[in-house]
Amino acid sequence: MINFALGPVTLSEEVCAIGAEQVPYFRTGKFSELMLENENYILKYCKAGKGSRAVFMTCSSTGAMEAVVMNCFSEKDKLLVINGGSFGQRFADLCRIHQIPAVSLKLEFGKKLTKERLYEYDGKGFTGLLVNVGETSTGVLYDAEMLGEFCRKNDLFFVCDTVYSFLADPFAMEEVHADIMITGSQKALACPPGVSVIVFSEKAVERVKKQKVESLYFNLDLMLKNQERGQTPFTPAVGILLQIHTRLKEIERRGGVEEEVKRVSRQAKDFREKIKDLPFSFLSESPSNALTALHPLRANAYSLFLLLEEEYGIWVCPNGGEQKETVFRVGHLGALGPEENSILLHALQDLQLRGLL
């Protein structure tokens, strides 16, 4: 199978090899050293500021989103949620579940956030802003710099979910004044799913220390204290953390975060150029490098997903909900190159010849 899904993605041979090894015991100095290296690489790649920290949670990225909501906010806050798809809605749902007042800035599916729309909420008493910098369900990439300026002007605590955009699109945490960055192991980190990463600015570290959170597993202050010695409070996904270490070193060896972003960008541009004459419309007004969301003009999107899987050995990523039959997504993350794009192109051309596209 050729994997154009958005996670898990195709792993490099080096990362796969680590997954085939026996999982070692982890309460050791050697594992602590590896975890501290993981933290330093992450802080370097997201361009975090002085005093920033990172922790690694054994959970899906939604678990990290929930941990941030629980540990950084309370019923005394008033949050603005950028809600342009299913993952923006997830932030809104988490706020509701934890009884934290929140207002959704709703965007039409696939539309970018403009400064005019954002500044309708200027000076309205908000204390925090939550955004999926890349909205995975639509492929839209929001302007993090514009959002950061808005947060500075209004003194908002700024939370950035970069689960699929980290390492695929440019992001400098300190430059955009983000207080929290969230990402996951199965996107551009190109490792198996199961580990989420939370990066804290110095301000966020202090905020978490003061927050009373009624949770043991999702207590981020406890996570931060343990990570000081390169450990976790509970048994982590040891094998995946070893694979993350291998992958982070792989990125460094290949020229660092800038080169990785360029590589993903080339992959996205190559795909979009190759399919420009096929009967699709592009969904996103401001597309991320990480994925291309496609609307088939004459075919059922979910049927195409099934045909590609069953007859061509190709995975793309179907949408759910109202977009199930109208949109599917093609990922550009992981160990893919132009040759894989060409294979997908030929499959789509064949479907067109068969009258199925």
What is each model feature region?
Residues K112-L167:
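Active-site phosphate-binding strand-loop segment of PLP-dependent enzymes
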